[in-house]
From Swiss-Prot:
The gene is ruvA. GO terms for cellular component: cytoplasm; Holliday junction helicase complex; Holliday junction resolvase complex. It comes from Salmonella schwarzengrund (strain CVM19633). Has three domains with a flexible linker between the domains II and III and assumes an 'L' shape. Domain III is highly mobile and contacts RuvB. This is Holliday junction branch migration complex subunit RuvA. InterPro entries: DNA_helicase_Holl-junc_RuvA_I, Hlx-hairpin-Hlx_DNA-bd_motif, NA-bd_OB-fold, RuvA, RuvA_2-like, RuvA_C, RuvA_C_sf. Residues 143-154 are annotated as: Flexible linker.
Amino acid sequence: MIGRLRGIILEKQPPIVLLETGGVGYEVHMPMTCFYELPEAGQEAIVFTHFVVREDAQLLYGFNNKQERTLFKELIKTNGVGPKLALAILSGMSAQQFVNAVEREELGALVKLPGIGKKTAERLIVEMKDRFKGLHGDLFTPAVDLVLTSPASPGSEDAEQEAVAALVALGYKPQEASRMVSKIARPDASSETLIRDALRAAL
């Protein structure tokens, strides 16, 4: 089981980061809320990982701290929620925002997330709220020293295309993703900024 990686970022293609550790490059799928905090390519980063084995693939999901990983593990225990949907949930909301939405039973906020209908949202509230009772209140308080960060890079010519592709990977339909990015697009924005703004606007 791979639980933690420390290495150099070779490439960032939302929501995937390619991290080199010991001469091996690992593709790590990350929620956009975690992806935003990564340093730029060529710099060192630490990610806490969860390894998922499927019939057709072996996937690594990465997080900036153990608390976010814990929430991801709890999410995929929920009936009808797989790793891809859990990734989309934690891309649309931070771990703390999700915990707050569940504890306050904010159904409206949850159904705005990609792939979450009313029934799934209700199930999340019932199942996750019960699990939170057995966890410490500060479990999902973000750690401050687990990843090295740096300012975001300037926008590129294909920033909008990258943003649309990332939203599609998170579960949005292509037309919907394009519309979301078009609403908030601006020439100087990086793909990460566009994705973050698009997700915020959707909520």
